[in-house]
Amino acid sequence: MGEELKVIVFALANEHYGIEVDKVRTIERMMPITRVPKTPAFIKGVINLRGVVIPVIDLRGRFGLEQTEATENSRIIIVASNDLEVGFIVDSANDVIDIDSDAIDTPPEVVGGIRAKYLRGVAKLDEQRLLIMLNLVEVLNKDEIIQLEQLEE
Amino acid sequence: MDMNAYLSMFIDESNDHLQSLNENLLRLESAPEDLSIVQVIFRSAHTLKGMSATMGFEDLASLTHEMENVLDLVRNNKLKMDGFIFDTLFKSLDVLDSMVQDIVGGGTGKADVSNIVASLKAIVSGEYRTDAAAGAPAKTGMDGEPRGIELDQFQISVLQQSMETGHQVFHIIVKVREDCVLKAARAYMVFELLERSGEVVKSEPSVQEIEQEKFDRSFSVYLITHKPMEELKTQIENVSEIESAQMTLLDEESLSLLSQPSKPQPAADRPAEDKRPAADENKLRTSGAQSGGAVTKTIRVDIERLDVLMNLFSELLIDRVRLEQLAGEIRRSDLTETVEHMARVSGDLQNIVLKLRMVPVESVFNRFPRMIRDLAKTLDKKVDLVITGAETELDRTVIDEIGDPLVHLLRNSIDHGIEATEKRLQAGKPESGTVNLRAFHSGNNVFIEIEDDGGGINRERVLATAIKNGVVTADQGKSMSDEEVYMLLFAPGFSTAEKISDISGRGVGLDVVQTKINSLGGAVGIQSELGKGTVFSIQLPLTLSIISAMLIKLGSEKFAIPLSSIMETSIIRREQIHHIHGSQMIEFRGAIIPIVSLSRLLASPDFDESQETETEVVIIRKGDKWAAVMVDEFIGQSDIVLKPLGNYLNGSPAVSGATILGDGQVALIIDPNALIK
């Protein structure tokens, strides 16, 4: 048996993703977002989280998935990594589960179109479902954003 | 005992003491006869020594100890200050300072102090005179006096003077308990107490010996004080582990008895010489006793806690605005009253919270006199620095940033502004140049001015250099006003000094100043008159955390523009916009100024001013450049709390930050400087 990991499970385009609980500050319902001009399309803008201004990213956009309108189930997961605090818009956030760190396998080369470097690994939830563990540092990597911006221009 | 807990306190206090040592030595240099200043210096050095010894910084303690020895001779009139002693003391302070900085950086505070200690020792023994070839005859002859309970002539005269002016003189014998463990510490507490209530003239054994526990069970002191005997006695005896305090009131008769065993007076002119410093000391003593009660009590607070307080308060401010809106909608008089009262209280609270972060500019200014002194010496110029308005307060964040730009400007004034001494005399000016450093409030701004009475700025030379360095073309130069030419000094890669010195004139510096001040939301200006002098003025916002702003609308989006850069608002018609060489301009108050489309710049999704026949514009200013910014609608003026956009979004163009509006929404703050090219 490896270490027990507490993981927040959220859904994005019919897939299940996981982030370690200690990286997550809060989970919020959708709230008004103020657009910030001249930023990549997946950066939705900034929100007021109890007096602190926090940027919000649409994770669908970040992973190059089709962006959809927010629904009743949409949530903003506020994560903190290094000295960055960022909100992720996800389709829904439903669960907190314990998984065994041994149960996380290294990701296969191609997983649902999302490049492997954003992923820490894949864990089996039950017979049907797989849980994709996010690599937060890579998701929040700004160097790549700069490249993206250059691509857009 | 965990010393780490005391380390930050030690560092803070050491810095304070070093600063006060520096200041007072400078004061003493201009008035070397004033023994009251020596007393103050001595006390600072003494406290510093005690503190460093307690914390285990041996080198610090031993260096301050030697300084103390020198100062002790000076304050007892056994040694006269001269240039060599000043230089050695200043050097010692520099070494002390670097040791303390080492401790701040996590070091051990160790340094090789043997050289400087040797010089100090030479001063004490009087040997240095042969090296320094000073003319004054040695006056250290009294060193060999036997030490006993008897007072020397100087101390006697001090005591006599005090009696004449109505003070009481006590002889106190303090006995510590037999089982006392920390004799030195208890004795120190007694000394603390005595020095608070009066002045200790003489102690037996000496203070140093008492601190090293070189006494048996009792020690005695002579004390000058206002306080009644009984009160003092109980206070001393209340110090733990003190057995008794035996006090005797001295009168002139007993005093003359005491002076009997002391040596005959060395020279007939001694008493006359002694009287004056004694009187000075008296003055100091009484003023010290009076101000002692009036000193305001302060505590040191971690700046981070103040930031948290500020954040919490700004949340409250946002809720207040929201409540006011709701109360306006609900229209119930008791609710409105409560909300109004809350608004008043929160207004007062805002003042206090902002004031907490305000620091007098003194904390930046106080290192300049020393810097100017050294600089003037290096350049062989005579310069007086006159500081006014050091009590003017600025936000802590601004204070932290303003130091370097000011150093640059001051160095520039002394290196390039103030002329060499011969040149000044030729021009009929006083030999020593004057640099005025002024700080004052005006409206929501603080101004800092640096004025020198030097040679002023030579327009032609500045222009020639600028043209040579390709900053402007000769044609451009002709049409420039004097002030525009002076501002070229702030252009990157500019230097007019013919001789490059290590003080300034590397061509970097002044442009750094302007960049820094601009980033603080301030502005720099120059006035100059050839042959008369130059004034550099810096305009700074009072605070960086709450600013007044104009809220505007672009379609559904709201933005804030800082009021400090708005000149006025106006409405223009479509046909007033001229297209000149591919850019849009309007005529405004007789000048042609560019017009900026905010909606295009910010890629506004639902507003386009080209659909309108009449457009609201905000006229903004950056230095002497103006521009008109087209907006959809004015909302109004409001105090807003600045919030950073966060690390993830830094460097968004034309946006300098965000704020939270009364309805809880985030509004972006436009950076007007980015709108004017």
What is the predicted function of each stretch?
Chain A
Residues 1-153:
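An acidic, low-aromatic, low-complexity terminal/linker signal
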